[in-house]
UniProtKB/Swiss-Prot annotation:
Family, as annotated: Belongs to the UPF0235 family.
Gene3D superfamilies for the chain: YggU-like (3.30.1200.10)
The organism's place on the tree of life at top rank: Bacteria
Pfam families: DUF167
Protein name, UniProt field: UPF0235 protein APL_1380
NCBIfam families associated with the record: DUF167 family protein, PRK05090.1
Gene Ontology CC: cytoplasm
Signal peptide range: none
Amino acid sequence: MEAVERIENPCGIRLRIFLQPKASRDQIVGLHDNELKIAITALPVDGAANAHLLKYLSKLFKVPKSSIVLEKGELQRHKQLFVPEPKLIPKEIEALL
């Protein structure tokens, strides 16, 4: 499985993410064991990290945060998300496609 995968039907991008909460800033770190490592500032408490991740990705891809689907890993650091019809693809992610 790839860290970033372009999906045709429905059109979008599937991300396999290793999430690092409690970071000093929000950023895409790079690849980590065939997953995209993303660091966020939120604490992993009561879904705050997931909400912050969705907000961060919605800004990067220029899509509404409600459209991003958390497919797997709600309570884990290893997550799988689907971003439907992104308006913009960040250069760090474009390089992995």
